[in-house]
């Protein structure tokens, strides 16, 4: 077997290189490949465990390292392939997981995977697994490994995903017990080979090592080390965090976890029986034994991590993964016990499994310690920094091992209680475990963290399940979820109505009990744990990060893949043993996009929710059982091998993707983020206990949160290029915001806890920030991007839970800030998840949002106060961060763009553009830049000393007067943009400079106009921000009054800017009108404002003609449209002295009469509404214009009023009259002679009446015509003469203006015309047709009988007499008819539509009338009836 394994491993080593080339394709392999599955499954079926022993040799070689790197991706493909072959691969995989619990089991898995890899070209992943497993198996007897292998193979064949898990698990357990001891020896002995391999691996490309291999190795190592629950679970926590990053994967993964938990429970039942004596005795026997086993197991893990460490020079991954593993160890035992009670049927097996897991944990810890020590040695050889980290990590591991051993004992003791609340306790334990891992990381001592350590053990178990599911998740996450759900049901694990919610299935009672126990345990160490966790987390994170660099270059690869958010978190989580909350915060900030993806794919299933919770520290925690179930699945054979491989491959791909994108420091930060996610998920899994555990330390967490938030804010403020800000703001900031708020907010009503946990988590994050500033700077760039969103006004800033979340921008404004919010979510998640599990165990996932626990009233009050203060602080930070982004925009325009133009000019040797034109394009930007730079400095200073002086509004009050400069910029904005476009068209050189600048990273591929628009949008942003700031201030606050004043100043500036904008629009409109007129006309004048425009029909002498009217505040423009689309200017009528009125006649209700000095006419609108609008607009304009004239000439106001009155009395000749249309008069309005073809109509120029030739023979000089002689009627001529005599001595007498042949004309007048005057009775002349005091007037059709033709006449009813006129302006009626004694009857005819009515006298038909419409007919009938009665 050994020789065979060695032979297989060398091929694996070459594959890593090939896989590295195919790193990008790795994520796609998620889809199961049947061929791959077939090849991988047979390999798994083969007894490859003996081959694992030779693998240690391969690890020593650099090729092995490469293999380890690429195998993760290969494994992903294999896993996908295995997904298709669920039956065979599942059996094999389940057996392997059991084997993982034992050393033998690990070997077969590796061998199978390696074979599959060789076939599939994914040998690298398998090699990683093999490398991890080989050291264990190398030390183990080959016989034991063979036996185990046989057992695993048998179990694989026996195991069904659901039915035969128990049988296989039993076999595996026996193997695990034997292998555990052998593994200890093997791990210890094999550590040197791994170390050498690691050292040699660093030579390989870090991407290769860090790619899929590191992920695969981590996961395999964890799976292999799973026999030691503590270490294994710790690793799983990391894995689960990584896995949980993609929501889809997380959902599948959670489901798989549940399935694995169920299968694990079944396996535990059989395994407990077999291994109760073995592993349980080992766990219970002594801490030393467990420590040894743990150390051995950890050795391989650490060693694998170490080889990758040399590849990752950046020690930023300061995640105390080892500490976390230790914490997980402690948690694992209680969690297992907790799971056991949850699974009543497999309770005994669960207990055994717990003991086995504890033993495994101890072994893992020992191995990890050994490996860390070796790694430290290697790191010392490689890098002093790595050595320092590894040494500290090793020390932490040793301490953690000791503490873990103690905690294991305590957990075993406490197991019964946890068993009752298996689901809840495991979840809560996970939460506590995270805190414990923090304590371990800090190195304060695991004794302090024993309680939380126990919880972390459960977390570790949960993580293990997640790791497996994570591995499978990449490729077969959906399958895993389904299997996990079924497995949970089989194992009788308490599951809510939604099988997908694996973490939630536990009943609320169990959860509560578990939480109480966890609270008791966690309450003791939490504070100490926090401090110790902080130190341990730093040290261990450094060490693990260094190792992870070597071992989990895959994490680096996944970080590179951070561009693919979904891939970032899921797999790189494994190596993080640091504070889970810290990881959460980091993950959210760095992997905001993945969180968003998780949020979207979020399924109704609990598994999906669990994944989301992991991703978003909030909801993932709710899946307590899912974590346990995943662990159980790992331990049990429930996980299908193909599924596991697929998940691993996907996780490795994700990890690779994420790692590849980020720097080593960033990788560390991301890993810490993953850890945070895991811890958050663990916490969510164990909300009750974990919640209580962390609750006691909520205040400390808050402190950490504050410090972290400050540190992150300070670091986050450092922005990358504006482009990065814009892009990251849009992508990363928005995604995390959505995911965090959507996932976390609904579940966590306990805002207090929500806030407290983040603070707790923030401490580790601060430490992480200190260690890995690179990641933080990237986060800060995303923060600035978020800040860049400031220009797009966003709704501020509150999270649904009432916690303040400034929006994507603020969350990302600083990694610390976003982490605080996420941490708050995580803490809130624990209580809310706990309560949510209770409330929604039988509900859909929606219940997680709808059903929330009720926070404590006292805590609520405190939360409200703190919430208000925090909101004010967050808004102030948002104002500052947005100001920083805006100043950067101004710098880009004022400095960077000018520098680009100057550089281009130097290259060409001549100016690209004139300085005068460039200054105009960038008009007023220098002043705005100086103003806002000073404003930013003061804001930053205030925020640094926020605790001392919580006020910022006074700064705006002080700078308020200078903000009016924005109005000047806004006023010239359109002109400057037009100038920019013009120069780009005319000047190719300048256009090239602009294009090149826009394509530069500094400009983020955004147009220059986009940035030039920012100052225009800034004042409205100030208004919104200050308004929100004021809303959250208490009236008693010192800054309340200043904020009101500042808001008033900003509103004034905004209004002024709006007015300026309007003026600019008015100017543009005036220019447009001027350009639309034919000829050269000066329409644009100072003070002239455009009011209204439209087309009205002008009643000319004969026909209606369209005219275009433009109304200004001082004149009415009267134009005629022409075919070219232009307008011919007829006249510009001044509003001075103009009158407008509507006619009194009913027939002309749509008409409008305008009288002015220059011209008067009747206008007809299309409707009465339009007529009224014009009438109102013109009347108001006339009134306003008259007021202005009085204002400018107050001394003449009275005189003007008198003159206007005089004009009204005697306007003759002073204004142009309205000419009566020709059609409205059929006779001379003076002599009543009828007009014919030869006897023509004439209009008097003084009064506008229609007169005949004889009546208009005189001419007279009129004022409105500048005293030019014009035809006037006799009446007007006499009146003008009288006025002339009154105003004498007048130089030009009327006689002089009379016609030249005045004497002749007098003679002609004396001669009677040949035309005979028609005698008209005086009665018919008493009333004119246009009389204004009539009861009714208008046009009607009249007929003297039914068969008579209709004739059109103008009728007037006055004094109960009906007058008939030929036209509306006739002075003499054609006839008159008294209406007394007549009756009116309406004729109801279908055709006539009630428009016809009859006039009867003594029942005899006199006339038949027809109106234009029924409405007017009804009015006429009423008028007639009124006239017929006395």
Curated annotation (Swiss-Prot):
Main location (coarse class): cytoplasm
UniProt-recorded Gene Ontology molecular function terms: guanyl-nucleotide exchange factor activity; small GTPase binding; zinc ion binding
Superkingdom in the source lineage: Eukaryota
InterPro entries, A to Z: DBL_dom_sf, DH_dom, FGD6_N_PH, FYVE_RhoGEF_PH, PH-like_dom_sf, PH_domain, Znf_FYVE, Znf_FYVE-rel
Gene3D superfamilies in alphabetical order: Dbl homology (DH) domain, Pleckstrin-homology domain (PH domain)/Phosphotyrosine-binding domain (PTB), Zinc/RING finger domain, C3HC4 (zinc finger)
Span of zinc fingers (FYVE-type): 1222-1281
Name the record gives this protein: FYVE, RhoGEF and PH domain-containing protein 6
